[in-house]
């Protein structure tokens, strides 16, 4: 990536999909993990912040608010604007909410969580509250939303963990 200070999101799952793709670092490709059992779709593009390691040992998860869905494998320069706090059966699993830095007419002026309609934040929160409901042995506990400053902390922690692991 050209700018080491720029954040990039790698999209695993496009907005509107029920398919859950995950990046497999051993294969170097995205793999279809499963189709969601519930009749819900991802409310935003979903993936991870490149060159980070989250508290769960995986790259830091993110959602990218886009006017139109992209595609699995798309890399988007992003700005973080908040964090959705949650845990799943594996532990802490926070999601950084981002906007694209690509001239998106809908999200170009968003720079903090307060710039997002409360109804959309509720929709995203509801999705993560129920999206695993029908999967045996899977569960989520949702917290709430945090602001841009908290997102910056989560990403700094994730970048430091990645740097430490990379040696």
Regions found by a protein language model. Name each.
Residues 1-167:
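Hydrophobic N-terminal alpha-helices or hydrophobic patches in metabolic proteins across all domains
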């Amino acid at each position: 990536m050209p700018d080491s200070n720029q954040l990039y999101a790698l999209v695993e799952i496009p907005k509107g999909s029920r398919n859950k793709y995950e990046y497999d670092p051993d294969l170097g490709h995205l793999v279809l993990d499963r189709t969601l059992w519930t009749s819900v779709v991802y409310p935003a593009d979903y993936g991870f912040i490149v060159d980070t390691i989250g508290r769960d040992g995986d790259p830091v998860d993110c959602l990218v608010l886009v006017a139109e869905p992209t595609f699995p494998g798309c890399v988007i320069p992003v700005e973080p604007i908040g964090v959705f706090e949650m845990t799943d059966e594996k532990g802490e699993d926070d999601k950084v909410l981002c906007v694209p830095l690509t001239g998106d007419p809908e999200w170009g002026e968003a720079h903090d969580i307060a710039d997002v309609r409360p109804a959309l934040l509720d929709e995203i929160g509801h999705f993560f509250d129920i999206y695993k409901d029908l999967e045996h042995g899977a569960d989520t506990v949702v917290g709430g939303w945090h602001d841009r400053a908290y997102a910056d902390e989560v990403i700094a922690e994730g970048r430091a963990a990645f740097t430490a692991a990379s040696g």
